[in-house]
From Swiss-Prot:
Membrane topology: Multi-pass membrane protein
Known tissue expression: Found in osteoblasts from mandibular bone and from iliac bone; not detected in osteoclastic cells.
GO CC annotation: extracellular region; membrane; outer membrane; plasma membrane
Known function: Transports adenosine triphosphate (ATP) and possibly other nucleoside triphosphates (NTPs) from cytosol to the extracellular space. Mainly regulates their levels locally in peripheral tissues while playing a minor systemic role. Prevents abnormal ectopic mineralization of the joints by regulating the extracellular levels of the calcification inhibitor inorganic pyrophosphate (PPi), which originates from the conversion of extracellular NTPs to NMPs and PPis by ENPP1. Regulates the release of the TCA cycle intermediates to the extracellular space, in particular citrate, succinate and malate.
Main subcellular localisation: membrane
Catalyzed chemical reaction(s): ATP(in) = ATP(out); citrate(in) = citrate(out)
Species per Swiss-Prot/TrEMBL record: Homo sapiens
GO terms classed as biological process: ATP export; bone mineralization; calcium ion homeostasis; cementum mineralization; diphosphate metabolic process; gene expression; inhibition of non-skeletal tissue mineralization; locomotory behavior
One of the Pfam families matching this protein, by short name: ANKH
Region entry Disordered, spans: 458-492
GO MF annotations in UniProt: ATP transmembrane transporter activity; inorganic diphosphate transmembrane transporter activity; phosphate transmembrane transporter activity
Protein's name according to its UniProt entry: Mineralization regulator ANKH
Superkingdom assignment: Eukaryota
């Protein structure tokens, strides 16, 4: 068997990240399978794709913050009591999300948000609100799955997490194929992707919960001991979670904002509906080569030996911060290569759209330029993920909050300014998203530098204090020092 000693320190990182990367890519494939379920409907396919895209992107705004409870499970859940608190938080959050879904579906608020703000016609608006109502229970199921995924990641069960997500996608693809041959294609085509989404989530949630009970539940204590900092309080969990939730909420609301501005820019015409449909089709395809880089932020908390919660998990790896940095750089280079191969090689991106989503060639050609813009996303995404993971390890997530605000400001500014430069449609949307990513990553880098300087100053002060104390207590008398020097001279 061939061995690579230079890679010894990186195998744990590879084994940990690869399943998570596959998970992220699998989610994108799942989205494409759902889009194919709509595109296969011959009548009003573009209108249905736009309606589902609007509803799905709004729903992602509610589920986004909950998926970051994975990081709470990764960092804070050290006992059964901690896990109960995390699950309780997610039950409440899921109920609140369901209430908002219902309000948007039935109230004037939903009519204003979807019909008026997006300038879509009555048909698209009513289909979007109906789809949003059907998706009301999904945030709760998604939250339960992600909470247990974080606990499994803490114990290095990333392979199980990856298998759960792949099972989710397989279930979605299977149910799309089954439902396309049912009466739903004629009576309620929107239910084809939505029911498939629910079945996939049910499979994923069940797999993760069973994995937790089989592998972890019996080995963790009922309560956390003092060596792990004691039981985590709900307040600590929420203080850690809210900046991450705010960031992910702004990431998820970015898509609805883009859809809104792109649609309004084109005046709610058929071109606007087509542009939103292009964005719906290109998001998962463009996200696929770089989306997995987001999972890099789980690496620092999982492998950093200064994190007290890692004492619970027995490990013999020798991964250092330097190894993590080099590994992160290689991941970014790999992602950039994938992006340029997929989106800049002639006819490759069109073939992906035609074969996977099932759109026609004319529609696929309209997606080429937006997809090429996605090629530049890996750099800001990698910077953000790497530094966020480091700050999560230090439990200093509060400094990340301003980055989400800057992202939205840059995004909206780009959506307003670029049309004056002749940029419209899906190209306007994806270009503005890139500008928002760059702005957010820049602010995260500034926040990380601020924390690093504070940490360095704190360590220098502690070292100086310890040096003074040791000088006062450990210094032998002057006569003893003289005797020691004389003895050394005699021996020489």
């Amino acid at each position: 068997m061939v061995k690579f000693p230079a890679l010894t320190h990186y195998w744990p990182l590879i084994r940990f990240l690869v399943p998570l990367g596959i998970t992220n890519i699998a989610i994108d494939f799942g989205e494409q399978a759902l889009n194919r379920g709509i595109a296969a409907v011959k009548e009003d396919a573009v209108e249905m794709l736009a309606s589902y895209g609007l509803a799905y992107s709004l729903m992602k705004f509610f589920t986004g913050p909950m998926s970051d409870f994975k990081n709470v499970g990764l960092v804070f859940v050290n006992s059964k009591r901690d896990r109960t608190k995390a699950v309780l938080c997610m039950v409440v959050a899921g109920a609140i999300a369901a209430v908002f879904h219902t309000l948007i579906a039935y109230s004037d608020l939903g009519y204003y948000i979807i019909n008026k703000l997006h300038h879509v016609d009555e048909s698209v608006g009513s289909k979007t609100r109906r789809a949003f109502l059907y998706l009301a229970a999904f945030p709760f199921m998604d939250a339960m799955a992600w909470t247990h995924a974080g606990i499994l990641l803490k114990h290095k069960y990333s392979f199980l997490v990856g298998c759960a997500s792949i099972s989710d996608v397989i279930a979605q693809v299977v149910f799309v194929a089954i439902l396309l041959h049912s009466h739903l294609e004629c009576r309620e085509p929107l239910l084809i992707p939505i029911l498939s989404l629910y079945m996939g989530a049910l499979v994923r949630c069940t797999t993760l919960c069973l994995g937790y009970y089989k592998n972890i539940h019996d080995i963790i204590p009922d309560r956390s001991g003092p060596e792990l900092g004691g039981d985590a309080t709900i307040r600590k969990m929420l203080s850690f979670w809210w900046p991450l939730a705010l960031i992910l909420a702004t990431q998820r609301i970015s898509r609805p904002i883009v859809n809104l501005f792109v649609s309004r820019d084109l005046g709610g015409s058929s071109a606007a509906t087509e542009a939103v449909a292009i964005l719906t089709a290109t998001y998962p395809v463009g996200h696929m080569p770089y989306g997995w880089l987001t999972e890099i932020r789980a690496v620092y908390p999982a492998f950093d030996k200064n994190n007290p919660s890692n004492k619970l998990v027995s490990t013999s790896n020798t991964v250092t911060a330097a190894h993590i940095k080099k590994f992160t750089f290689v991941c970014m280079a790999l992602s950039l290569t994938l992006c340029f191969v997929m989106f800049w090689t002639p006819n490759v991106s069109e073939k992906i759209l035609i074969d996977i989503i099932g759109v026609d060639f004319a529609f696929a050609e309209l997606c080429v330029v937006p997809l090429r813009i996605f090629s530049f996303f890996p750099v800001p995404v990698t910077v953000r993920a790497h530094l966020t993971g480091w700050l999560m390890t230090l439990k200093k997530t509060f400094v990340l909050a301003p980055s989400s605000v800057l992202r939205i400001i840059v995004l909206i500014a780009s959506l307003v300014v670029l049309p004056y430069l002749g940029v419209h449609g899906a190209t306007l949307g994806v270009g503005s998203l890139l500008a928002g990513f760059v702005g957010e990553s820049t602010m995260v880098a500034i926040a990380a530098c601020y924390v690093y300087r504070k940490q360095k100053k704190k360590m220098e002060n502690e070292s100086a204090t310890e040096g003074e104390d040791s000088a006062m207590t450990d210094m032998p008398p002057t006569e003893e020092v003289t005797d020691i020097v004389e003895m050394r001279e005699e021996n020489e």
